[in-house]
């Protein structure tokens, strides 16, 4: 059993700093799920200083604090012809960001595993894992499918020369980590890798049956638990990139199907928006909001919605 704090896409936000005040005895691991750059609110150089602070925090205890890479980070490292232009929104700072990432590649992983749960930026599909295994078979001596696991994948990632596009292994690996879609502009294809894949495709083709991911902003006020067949995925990212409660690897969570989630999401969002639309008619806004939320939701849920949606 492990208690894990999963920190969703950062995008320059300082919200992660709340974990610095949590006693180490209260958790087993802290996992950063990537996307440290490309903020639409926080400008440069604060984004760079924020990333340095995150790296320093992780280096204080690399055994229990894990730093994973996201698509917005990898776009600055890619050696392929088009990879660097896919999600890099700060071309005027690309050299500085690339240097910061390279200086800390020794602590940046692709994924983390704990008690059968796989933590990554976006998730692993069967289709993508087959692609990467094919590369390993063709370019690594004596590789067997049985060798493939998260530790092995991270080891190969750390062996890459992230500056040499003439290195065939590095180029092939990077190409698979780049945007790898053909039909969808959002990344909703099973061919997409662990930095890009979206919920529908991940749930239908998950390589690991238990995964925790960021990347897609599904959450309103709490983590989202979705399942399809035997696949169970916990989604942790929201539009405001809030940090939610611990993930307990021994706990049984209530998972929804995508249709169930869509219905719940629309209904919940309508209630929240209706309450916000009525605020101009009430002098005591706080009391009105709390009473309205308590009318529609349990006390626990109402408190969470108030905290993340109205404060």
Regions found by a protein language model. Give the residues of each.
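Core catalytic region of metal-dependent phosphoesterases/phosphodiesterases
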Residues: 7, 12-101
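Catalytic phosphate/metal-binding cores of nucleic-acid and nucleotide-processing enzymes, i.e., regions
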Residues: 37-41, 67, 193, 197-210, ...
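Active-site-proximal loop/helix segment associated with metal-binding centers of metalloenzymes
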Residues: 117-203
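Active-site environment of divalent metal-dependent phosphoester hydrolases
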Residues: 12-17, 38-40, 72-78, 125-127, ...
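Beta-strand-turn-beta hairpins that frame and shape the catalytic cleft
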Residues: 1-5, 112-118
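Short hydrophobic beta-strand that contains or immediately precedes a catalytic carboxylate
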Residues: 6-8, 69, 119-120, 213, ...
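Intrinsically disordered, low-complexity coil/linker segments enriched for acidic/polar
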Residues: 284-286, 295-298
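Binuclear metal-dependent phosphoesterase catalytic core
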Residues: 217-283, 287, 303-311
